Amino acid sequence: MPIVDSGSVPALTAAEKATIRTAWAPVYAKYQSTGVDILIKFFTSNPAAQAFFPKFQGLTSADQLKKSMDVRWHAERIINAVNDAVVAMDDTEKMSLKLRELSGKHAKSFQVDPQYFKVLAAVIVDTVLPGDAGLEKLMSMICILLRSSY
């Protein structure tokens, strides 16, 4: 299933949730380094996205990005937001509330182009569990909810 960012929020099966939790645990155990790696992959393949992060301007190499405290801080926030969604897979109302709030911030305060949510989600899937339909569904849930304020 490809990652989508519109339509109805897909439901996860118990087996998909179990697979996601199992795959996510070692990723989250190294959340700082994994988060930075994901963000660097995202910026490397989508350099225009870096314009939405004023504090990242002038960081032109992967090494500069990796050493930046601002990049590390934001990467940690992304990984923690995904972790919140993983933890809340059994409480979609809680997940929805948190992600809709995050959507409002990204739409109104940061004016992020919402197309990048899906692109970043694909990088996360490729890093955590490439091609897994359940994780793609979870990322679709996140992307749909993050677009809710646009």
UniProtKB/Swiss-Prot annotation:
Cysteines engaged in disulfide bonds, as pairs: none
Family annotation (Pfam families): Globin
Keyword Ribonucleoprotein in record: no
Residue stretches making up the Globin domain: 11-150
Keywords: Heme, Iron, Metal-binding, Oxygen transport, Transport
Gene3D superfamilies: Globins (1.10.490.10)
Keyword Heme listed: yes
Family: Belongs to the globin family.
Note: This is one of the minor globin component of Sea lamprey.
Name the UniProt record assigns to this protein: Globin-1
Species of provenance: Petromyzon marinus (Sea lamprey)
